Design a protein with these regions (language model features):
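Non-catalytic, surface beta->alpha helical segment in thiol-disulfide oxidoreductase systems
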Residues: 99-126
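Structural micro-motif
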Residues: 89-98
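A short beta-strand-turn-helix
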Residues: 25-42, 83
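Thiol-based oxidoreductase modules, predominantly thioredoxin-like and allied folds used
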Residues: 47, 66, 70-84
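N-terminal targeting signals for export/organelle localization
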Residues: 1-25
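Typically the conserved alpha-helix immediately C-terminal to a functionally engaged Cys/Sec
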Residues: 54-68
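Short pre-active-site segment immediately N-terminal to redox-active cysteine/selenocysteine motifs
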Residues: 40-43, 47-51, 93
């Protein structure tokens, strides 16, 4: 049996560690994506893989952009497991970012790690 003090300490430690485990956006869900499109939202689809060095470079930039644009909906597509989504978006490479304004794709980039072009890419949805 764990004491309440130990449980509280464990909870605090887990909470402190969470930001390092957090990722931008939310896992891709086709239905939620369609709802966002129908609502005319600005959307960023981030095709990523946990082992991808370019994706790791993009991650903090995407997180910053997400903070700068609170109305931006970000969906993470796992390159290794989300094969249906990869076909849907015609994606062949990880580290691909796709920007939508509602149902219309307005921009796409693969492998870009410079913050300025990525910000310009997302700005096309606003």
């Amino acid at each position: 049996m764990f004491s309440n003090t130990f449980r509280k300490a464990l909870l605090i430690a887990a909470t402190v560690a969470m930001p390092s485990l957090a990722s931008a956006g939310q896992p891709f869900d086709a239905k939620a994506f369609q709802v966002s499109q129908a609502a005319g939202k600005s959307i960023l689809v981030d095709v990523t893989a946990p082992w991808c060095p370019t994706c790791k470079q993009q991650r903090p930039i995407v997180e910053e952009i997400e903070k700068e644009h609170p109305d931006l909906v970000v969906y993470d597509v796992d390159f290794d497991t989300a094969k249906d989504a990869l076909r849907q978006f015609r994606v062949q490479h990880k580290s691909t970012l796709i920007v939508f304004k509602g149902a219309k794709e307005v921009a796409r980039s693969t492998g870009e790690t410079d913050p300025a072009p990525l910000r310009s890419l997302v700005a096309k949805a606003f």
